[in-house]
Design a protein with these regions (language model features):
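Terminal disorder- and signal-encoded targeting elements
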Residues: 1-175, 190, 200-201, 205, ...
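Generic preference for hydrophobic
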Residues: 139, 171, 210-211, 230, ...
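Short beta-strand and adjacent tight-turn residues that come in two discontinuous sequence segments
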Residues: 194, 211-213, 306-307
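Small-molecule pocket liners
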Residues: 225-230, 336-342
Length: 408
């Protein structure tokens, strides 16, 4: 692992409204990015219109089963102008689970002075008596089905945090978004990777300071972010497009967690923009997380699920799901990924050491990049700017920031 020059990505999301974004045609990057910041918001776009016409329910193509149950009828996949449905294996082969660095660059075009919704990131207190200087730094990564699974994966980073701060680091195994936010609010947790949708809760409730996201820094172009994929079984005859979720009886669709961006909040805002209203048009069942949603669809426990693309990619890579047995019927443009954060009361010297450990090292050749689909580089971000699309979604849903809304 080599030390590198710090890269700064203090960015700007375009000023388009959520409606403008979700209404973009999913086809080309050109107009989906345009003024709206491309990836960020157009989250409804990549597939917004393409899912409707390409997948539909496919009719029955001259047989008893509708065409969307036969992958040989699926359109050729073009990442710049995607049409659906598509096998998950096809999307993964094309690298469509992430966006490009150009998506992040588009977010940088119009920096914001303050968040559009909720409070600004808290400053470090002026009163030194309020600063935290613990012997051991408590660190937590966004909860998974097995919260301990990433402790050894992150060892190169944890070792560098110890080296740069002079503090020992304990990997805290927390099992929910609410537990993470509450632990930082009570200053029992000092460092955390908060999932995309939970970041504003952490900022507003726990005085978290998001400062960095992971990217794939290898190769010439690199990759950034993740997408919302709406998945169902290939052989599900009832669902071949987003519109097919409007069923009678209602389809049982898994949402990950109330505070999850791609697993709940974004679908509520963006699907409604396409005329499909969760809980009115289909039944919502909270699975507890993206892994659980993915496995639940694969095991026929749910009819469909909106999931984080990189999350299901990890489940597939671990051979828990056959990607040729699931299809994606709708996809978003890229969202920002997990935001790595520290509590604002952490001693300034420790804050700077933490930032060095994340931003001044190249982790591309480590277990971190291996586990996280090549994302072995951390870059600096500005919360108000890069999270603007997420805040647009949460504003449109009138989200209230309290830990009760983080409970499953």
């Amino acid at each position: 692992m080599r030390q590198v020059d710090r890269r700064k990505f203090v960015s700007g999301i375009g000023a388009a409204t959520l409606a403008g974004v979700a209404g973009c045609s999913g086809g080309s990057d050109g107009d989906s990015s345009g003024d709206s910041g491309g990836s960020d918001d157009s989250s409804g776009d990549s597939s917004g219109d393409s899912s409707g016409d390409s997948g539909g329910d496919g009719g029955d193509s001259g047989s008893d089963a509708p065409a969307h149950t036969d992958p040989s009828t699926y359109p050729d996949f073009d990442p710049s102008s995607p049409e659906f449905p598509q096998l998950l294996s096809t999307l993964l082969d094309a690298g469509f689970e992430t966006g490009a660095m150009s998506d992040l660059e588009r977010m940088q075009e119009n920096p914001r002075d303050e968040p559009r919704y909720g409070q600004a990131v808290a400053e470090t207190p002026d009163d030194e008596s309020e600063w935290l200087d613990p012997d051991t730094l408590e660190f937590s990564l966004t909860p998974t089905e097995d919260p301990t699974v990433y402790e050894e994966t992150l060892r190169p980073l944890l070792d560098n945090i110890e080296e740069e701060t002079g503090k020992s680091v304990n990997y805290a195994s927390l099992d929910s978004y609410a537990a993470q936010v509450e632990a930082m609010r009570s200053e029992r947790l000092h460092l955390a990777g908060f999932s995309t949708g939970a970041v504003p809760y952490a900022v507003n409730i726990a005085n978290a300071v998001p400062f960095s996201v992971q990217i794939d820094g290898s190769g010439e172009n690199g990759s950034f972010g993740y997408r919302l994929w709406l998945i169902t079984q290939v052989d599900n005859p009832d669902i071949g497009s987003l519109e097919d979720l409007k069923g009678d009886p209602k389809q049982n669709v898994a949402h990950a967690d109330p505070s999850s961006n791609s697993g709940n909040l974004a679908p509520r805002a963006l699907f409604a923009n396409q005329g499909v209203v969760p809980e009115e048009d289909y039944e919502v069942s909270y699975s507890g997380g993206h892994q659980q949603s993915s496995l639940g669809v694969a095991n026929d426990d749910y009819e469909a699920a909106p999931v984080c693309s990189t999350c299901i990619a990890r489940v597939i890579r671990d051979d828990q799901i056959d990607p040729t047995q699931l299809k994606c019927i709708w996809a978003s443009d890229p969202f920002p990924t997990t935001a790595f954060s520290y509590v604002n009361t952490l001693h300034p010297d420790i804050q700077e050491g933490v930032r060095r450990a994340f931003l001044d090292y190249d982790y591309q050749g480590t277990t971190i990049a291996e586990e996280f689909e090549g994302r072995g580089t951390w870059v600096e971000i500005d919360y108000a700017t890069v999270w603007d699309i997420i805040l647009q979604i949460q504003e449109s849903l009138e989200v209230e920031y309290n830990t009760g809304d983080l409970e499953e």
